[in-house]
From Swiss-Prot:
It holds the Pfam family Tmemb_14. One of its GO terms (biological process) is regulation of heme biosynthetic process. This is Transmembrane protein 14C. It is a multi-pass membrane protein. It comes from the Eukaryota. The keyword Transmembrane helix applies. Keywords: Heme biosynthesis, Membrane, Mitochondrion, Transmembrane, Transmembrane helix. It is found in: Mitochondrion membrane. It comes from Rattus norvegicus. Required for normal heme biosynthesis. GO terms for cellular component: mitochondrial inner membrane; mitochondrial membrane; mitochondrion. The chain crosses the membrane at residues 8-28, 33-53, 63-83, 88-108.
Length: 115
């Protein structure tokens, strides 16, 4: 019997791309509007997402930092999108964050049901 090697593309690969997207969004917000809070939040959350992706690359069961970061951003940016109705940047980051939360929750369910 062949052992299941996991998903075709591990979650941390997407996690590094997500971290880069968040950090780049903060940099673009600063460059276009001069928004220092956007720069600070983008670099902070992008750094946390990068740390979470790195932890996932070392131990696929260590999903907590990544899940907390993407879940927090999904909530914050989801509310901004709901209130403003503007897709950029709030809708984009909220959508990307939700796409990261779903496999993170699935990973937790997988971990908790392991014997």
């Amino acid at each position: 019997m062949q052992k299941d090697s996991g998903p075709l593309v591990p979650l941390h690969y997407y996690g590094f791309g997500y971290a880069a997207l968040v950090a780049t969004g903060g940099i673009i917000g600063y460059a276009k509007a001069g928004s220092v809070p956007s720069l600070a939040a983008g670099l902070f959350f992008g750094g946390l997402a990068g740390l979470g992706a790195y932890q996932l690359s070392q131990d696929p069961r260590n999903v907590w930092v990544f899940l907390a970061t993407s879940g927090t951003l999904a909530g914050i940016m989801g509310m901004r999108f709901y209130n403003s109705g503007k897709f950029m940047p709030a809708g984009l980051i909220a959508g990307a964050s939700l796409l990261m939360v779903a496999p993170g929750v699935a990973k937790i369910q997988e971990i908790t049901t392991m014997p």
